[in-house]
A protein has these predicted regions:
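A substrate-binding/cap region within the structured catalytic cores of diverse enzymes
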Residues: 1-55
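C-terminal regions of proteins
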Residues: 45, 49-60, 64-67, 73-139
Length: 139
């Protein structure tokens, strides 16, 4: 309703189509299919709210570096929080994605650290724990 819309962050928009596709893939089987759109709307509000708060801090403290620690999905592969901060005029945004490789097979390790064929790189840097993949071209 209109009253609730007033509570949304300024210039609110839903995440892009790739972000929605990843979200749908991740949520499939966890929530009813007919509810995925509503959950995605909530995810997008969350991302926009975090971006709005980050921008406020950066505007008040332009000489500072802001580190935001969020769940991986909000930052990996684009579409979430980093994109929303960039859309608001702040270009110096970097994503460090932390991945525990300890329990993964060699194929899982490689598919986790090399850029995804559809989504691209999971971040600007990937911080791994455990053993890196034996044949990773990005070591």
């Amino acid at each position: 309703n209109e009253e609730e819309r007033k509570l949304l962050p300024e210039n609110f928009s839903l995440g892009n189509s790739n972000y929605f596709a990843r979200f749908r893939e991740t949520m499939s089987g966890h929530v009813p299919e007919q509810s995925i759109q509503k959950y995605f709307e909530a995810q997008s509000v969350w991302d926009d709210t975090m971006a709005t708060q980050a921008i406020r801090i950066l505007q008040r403290n332009p000489q500072q570096i802001l580190v935001v620690i969020v769940g991986d999905f909000h930052a990996q592969y684009g579409g979430g929080l980093p994109d929303r901060i960039r859309q608001r005029g702040f270009e110096n945004v970097y994503v460090i994605s932390q991945v525990d490789l300890t329990e993964l097979s060699e194929q899982e390790k490689s598919s986790t650290v090399i850029p995804h064929p559809q989504w691209g790189p999971r971040g600007d840097w990937i911080w791994t724990s455990g053993n890196p993949p034996i044949s990773s071209p990005h070591q």
